[in-house]
Amino acid sequence: MNVTLFVTCLVDLFHVNVGKATVELLERLGCTIHFPEAQTCCGQPAYNSGYVKEAKEAMKHMIRTFEHAEYIVTPSGSCATMFKEYPHIFKGDGEWEARAKRVADKTYELTQFIVDVLQVEDVGARLEGKATYHTSCHMTRLLGVKDAPLTLLQHVKGLEVVPLPNAHNCCGFGGTFSVKMGPISEQMVDEKIQCIEQVEADYLIGADCGCLMNIGGRIERKGKPIRVMHIAEVLNHR
């Protein structure tokens, strides 16, 4: 099965190991990975900040880059959601609406692809300890991926997965929200960390690097002994 990897900006710039884990995991599951070097940002930051014209240029570039893929897989619910939004953004724009739909229809978040397309629930991972899972806003509310990550984590040998109180509350990242509304964002992430501490988790696992950077940065600043991991790293752990 041919998979074209949409690596995302945050993985490319700050979390290279997440990209490596994604590739190794999918290859172990029998996929052939393709990586278009021309890929850039999906346009989400510009679009959400109101720079629609500039964002559309980035989106058109990504459509041209990915439209011939068999499957498009990304280790980010947020960026997968943006690809899924392309047809709506280009609605009424003849050629580009159709091309955007072709890209959107074959785009999957990593865990969604493993469970729904590959039909795999146990990837053979092993990790000792207690973990809790942070459900990112875009992935659950917009993309609608809720069960796949937990299904995969429940099959990780040695890992006890405990529910996170107020799991669906935002961590305070929200892209540019954390910059524009710093004090509010800080309170939100502090509440998230309190919930993580409440369940005495060794690991905080998530599927979006933006959330993990926000939560992980605050955990580090507070000196808490909690390891933050992307779900791709967990599923690739042996």
From Swiss-Prot:
It comes from the Bacteria. Signal peptide: none annotated. GO terms for molecular function: oxidoreductase activity. InterPro entries: Cys_rich_dom, LutA. GO terms for cellular component: cytosol. GO terms for biological process: lactate metabolic process. Belongs to the LutA/YkgE family. Is involved in L-lactate degradation and allows cells to grow with lactate as the sole carbon source. This is Lactate utilization protein A.
